[in-house]
Amino acid sequence: MVATIDSIEMPALPTAVEAHPMKGGDDSHSYSQNSCYQKGVIDAAKAVIVEAVNEKLDLENNPIFDPIKPFRIADFGCSTGPNTFHAMQNIVESVETKYKSLQKTPEFHVFFNDHVNNDFNVLFRSLPPNREFFAAGVPGSFYTRVFPKNSIHFAHCSYALHWLSKVPKEIQDKNSLAYNKGRIHYTGTEKHVVKAYFGQFQRDFEGFLKARAQEIVVGGLMVIQIPGLPSGEVLFSRTGAGLLHFLLGTSLMELVNKGIINEESVDSFNLPQYHPSVEDLEMVIEMNDCFTIERVGTLPHPMKNLPFDVQRTSLQVRAIMECILTEHFGENILDPLFEIYTKNLQENFHVFDKEIRKDADLYLVLKRKGN
């Protein structure tokens, strides 16, 4: 049975959704200056968006997509730019081209969504002056509703859904089989830890889909890009991202050995991230039953063919992790930590150049089912 808007039971609003925005501002350590890999994902996804609009977006004689009314687009997990602007322009251009083939031209309204402590000031200061859309910011967790029912025609989410709403409680419980002592992630850990992370991802992704099912119009599209695994047979520990997480943990332990932080603070720190396989994603979408999977696959990323760059990688990881690390350990550890981290990256250069090829930038094209 196809789920209807009114039959979808929304998950309860989380009592404590963790928010870990990317490093704000526009200095040398900011996310806006250190997100070229993420831009590569968006550039690679442009062809996917063009094809999805051309083949899957039914505009002709469809009152849901009346060109007299604005065509509304939402970017969930927009961060601080400029990548979100590239993604939104790709969508606007694709939809506009299709409307023009029907001799129609709507106005476009783009909504930029992220947590309330995202640096929206930097985002809106850098809005393209010649943009072809009206812009608005929408603060709030995308794991819950942030828009009215049937209000969004095209949803987009890039490199955001691997961030969990919270760390799985089992891995912080000393009496649990999943207690993750001495590690900051599920890289190379026991199966109980991996299971706890996947369980949290499953709950979060289901909440995301339920919320979007209420907000997206029937026939509306959603394109998702997420770092993940090409299949369930590939271990996260055998990927470049897995090695990045592992070395961040070992770098923190070096600070413990130097007496800069204590071991208990590392034991109580875990990264709220899960990198899913295609099978993980398909399972949750099919259980949700509100969207059809129009396309799923792996994006070709141009940087995968470049030599591993230690300094650039260290800066990118710092831009992503600085806020969550500062919140737990304080900002005084950042410089010594990333000095050690850069050294560890250099020492493992040969491993990265091989393992990073096993990472997968996954994409999904989903279409909202009819009631």
From Swiss-Prot:
Report which superkingdom the organism of origin falls in.
Eukaryota
Tissue-level expression: Expressed in leaves (especially in leaf epidermis), flowers, siliques and stems, and, at low levels, in hairy roots.
Q: Where is the signal peptide?
A: none
Name of the protein in its database record: Loganic acid O-methyltransferase
Quaternary structure and partners: Homodimer.
* MF annotations from Gene Ontology: loganate O-methyltransferase activity; metal ion binding
Annotated source species: Catharanthus roseus (Madagascar periwinkle)
Q: In which pathway does it act?
A: Alkaloid biosynthesis
Q: What is the effect of changing residue 31 to F?
A: Strongly reduced activity
